[in-house]
Amino acid sequence: MMQDLRLILIIVGAIAIIALLLHGLWTSRKERSSLFRDRPVKRHKHDRQNSFVDDSDDEAFDNQQKPYAHKQVKSHQEYKAEPAIERRQQKLTEIDAATPEESDDPLLTGRQPETTARRAAIEEQEPQLGLFEFEEQNESERNGSAIEEKSQEAAGEKEAQTKVKEIVLVLHVAAHHGQELNGESLLQSILQSGFQFGEMQIFHRHVNPSGSGPVLFSLANMVKPGSFNPETMVDFTTPGVSIFMMVPSYGESSQNFKLMLQAAQRIASDVGGVVLDDERKMLTPQKIELYKARIRSTLGVQV
């Protein structure tokens, strides 16, 4: 009985000793693994503290040597990357790349300049897509303006040439020196010469003596304003009348001038007056030829 009890105690003691040994080994390994796992963190903390100390020393030195550059040093230190922060930024690179907006986290400020620069480059390229269109549009507008200006200049030159081509030939029927023409006899002679009273209150010679068709030449009073009143011409007197025509005119200008000359000579004969040229001098054959030459010259320019 005593031997059995002793054997049991020996076995229980051996088991207890083995359990204690195993527990000691397990505890030792656990502490060792925990020690190795904590060492990098402590080392990183120590390095970061040293970095902060170095930065503080550098800042103090720079403040002593360059007091006016304090803001530049501080700005440079804010963007200075720490070892632990750089590793954290590397882990968050994928997250930042997937995020469309810029992060406000101070730890990610190192990445913001790159993102901002990329966006700025894209934004600068986008407006340039329409730059050439705008330049082409401006070029088209300038070309259109130049063409329009040239067209206006050509039209102006053409109009000026047209105005230069048109001339006025004038003949005067005047009374002798110190006399005046009688209105009643003058009116009868004017009507017999084929004139009709019309626009501007003067007489006009139309293609048809009845008063229809285009006007070939006209007759006005030499006294301003040059108009007539047929109802009061019985008691009317005037120093003379003026007959004028435009060149070119309807039909043949040379033939129209002959008709005007014949009408002036007939009226002068009826009222006892004389025919004068545009300078109010006696009309001579040489002056008549000069009128015809002016007509030919004007028509030649037109052609």
UniProtKB/Swiss-Prot annotation:
Cytoplasmic face of the membrane: 28-303
Stored Pfam families: ZipA_C
Keyword Electron transport: no
Localization: Cell inner membrane
Alphabetical list of CDD domains matching this protein: ZipA (cd00231)
Residues in compartment: Periplasmic: 1-6
Residues covered by region (Disordered): 39-61, 66-85, 124-159
Gene Ontology BP, a term: FtsZ-dependent cytokinesis
PANTHER family per the UniProt record, alphabetical: CELL DIVISION PROTEIN ZIPA
HAMAP family with a match to the protein in the record: ZipA (MF_00509)
Protein name as it appears in the record: Cell division protein ZipA
High-level lineage: Bacteria, Pseudomonadati, Pseudomonadota, Gammaproteobacteria, Enterobacterales
GN (gene name): zipA
